[in-house]
């Protein structure tokens, strides 16, 4: 804040008094710019300076009992942050045209993340990865492998700017989601959030539309029946993934506004796809997947609540 202009007259006239007794005290106030993520919003916490964890690396409750040692690798693959990070890293690298390298990637990450997988388990992981690579995605109806043949980005990091002058309007966010059938219960913390950060696992283009794909290693159970579309939808509600998906699509919405001269959300936003990897099985092709598309007016409304015009 700038101080008021000084009076003229060299300090000797009647109009000039002792500044120590009459001048107002001018103070400059600095409001910190804080950053948050989807996971931090759910914890009602602000991440100060430490690097953001990818959303998949945030620990979630794993209540299902352990599978028998001889069960399918989908159910015996280790749970937790490190195994999830390792699987995401492999999925970022593999493509149909580098099939001969998959085993090398698995062995490398098995050592790096200290997963302790035996050679027979790595064999099973290769078969599992093949099922994932060739499964049909729920919105675009192409395979994951095919989605990597055209324009795409893996691990696409983004930062959403919000209005620096006011606190993030948590009640408005809750009301916006409730009005569209996805009630949230975020706590109204009066935080001055300047940035929301995140990372999209896989962003790709198909037939002129842009799709968001997110991988989940959540363990929902030890049988195919635990990964039906109905159970996937329930799990997404339990973990507030509707919010995560919406933030991802707002980020894509803002990106395309700057890249496409003829951008039209109804024409270019292709939808959001979630793969619950432990449920991907050719014997049960409908399992482990969930996809939908928010209406353009929902994304535009959330964008306004986040303060895009003032950001």
Model regions and ranges:
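Structural signature of nuclease core domains in nucleic-acid processing machines
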Residues: 1-311
């Amino acid at each position: 804040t700038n101080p008021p202009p000084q009076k003229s007259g060299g300090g000797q006239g009647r109009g000039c008094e002792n500044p120590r007794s009459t001048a107002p005290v001018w103070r400059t106030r600095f409001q910190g710019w804080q950053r948050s993520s989807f996971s931090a919003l759910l914890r009602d916490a602000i991440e100060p300076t430490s690097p953001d964890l990818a959303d998949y690396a945030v620990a979630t409750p794993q209540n299902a009992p352990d599978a028998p040692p001889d069960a399918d690798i989908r159910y015996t693959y280790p749970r937790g942050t490190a195994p999830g990070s390792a699987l995401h890293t492999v999925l970022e690298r593999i493509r149909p045209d580098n099939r001969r390298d998959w085993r090398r990637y698995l062995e490398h990450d098995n050592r790096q993340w200290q997963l302790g997988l035996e050679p027979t388990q790595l064999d099973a992981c290769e078969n599992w990865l093949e099922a994932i690579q060739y499964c049909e995605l729920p919105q675009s109806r192409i395979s994951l492998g095919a989605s990597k043949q055209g324009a795409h980005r893996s691990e696409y990091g983004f930062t959403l700017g919000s209005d620096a002058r006011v606190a993030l309007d948590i009640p408005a966010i809750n009301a916006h989601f409730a009005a569209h059938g996805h009630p949230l219960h975020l706590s109204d913390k009066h935080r001055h959030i300047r940035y929301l950060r995140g990372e999209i696992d896989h962003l790709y283009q198909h037939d002129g539309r842009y799709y968001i794909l997110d991988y989940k290693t959540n363990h929902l159970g030890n049988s195919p029946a635990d990964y039906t579309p109905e159970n996937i939808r329930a799990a997404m509600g339990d973990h507030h993934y509707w919010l995560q998906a919406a933030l991802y699509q707002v980020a894509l919405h803002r990106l395309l506004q700057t890249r496409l001269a003829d951008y039209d959300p109804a024409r270019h936003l292709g939808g959001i796809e979630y793969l619950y990897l432990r449920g991907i099985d050719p014997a049960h092709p409908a399992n482990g997947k969930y996809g939908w598309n928010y209406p353009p007016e929902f994304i535009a409304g959330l964008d306004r609540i986040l303060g895009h015009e003032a950001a």
